[in-house]
Amino acid sequence: MNKNHRHTYEIRRAIPQDCAKLAELAADVWLDTYATDGIKPEYTEYANSTFTTAYFQSLLEHPTYRLLISEQAGVLQGFVLINLGAQYRTPDNGYEVDKLYVHKSFQGMGVGRALLSHVARLYGTPMWLYTWTENAANQFYSRLGAQLIGTLSFEAFGSTIDNNVYKITSENL
């Protein structure tokens, strides 16, 4: 049980019964973060076809993925998905934080940091992640003291998406 000055929450491994809530939260956070120019049909299609109950169930069964959630009294606040098999450039950067999604109602309350700290206790550090250069989460990673170690770009929705790549060590948590 984690406590901060605002609330108490539990962090635990996700179970199959969490998958429907995870799908809803993921679609919600994704649209809130990336649909900055409004809800276009292709955004809705992506979110609804990607973040499904079956998607999260498959992650629970995948040998290199680990999925942890933060909840309070059955209310899902956020989750972290790590991929122990993914590397960025070199093994020295550790494993990948594939997703760190916190519902906007719980952002700024220590949930994201607590999820990353819990992951570090279970799987060690360092860990790396990438985030869209226009994502407000860049401020969070900067405050955390994460080290900017590169950039990563890919094509999506007819545009080039530029991302910052960060490395997080135990000193950041």
Stretch-by-stretch model annotation:
Residues 54-59, 144-145, 149, 162, ...:
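A general structural signal for short secondary-structure boundary/capping elements
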Residues 113-114, 134-151, 159:
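Conserved active-site alpha-helix within GNAT-family acetyltransferase domains
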Residues 2-5, 160-173:
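Terminal substrate-recognition subdomain of acyl/acetyltransferases
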Residues 66-69, 129, 164:
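Hydrophobic beta-strand residues of extracellular immunoglobulin-like
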Residues 5, 9, 13-19, 24-37, ...:
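Acetyl-CoA-dependent GNAT
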Residues 122-133:
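Conserved GNAT acetyl-CoA-binding A-motif
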Residues 110:
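Glycine-rich phosphate-binding loop
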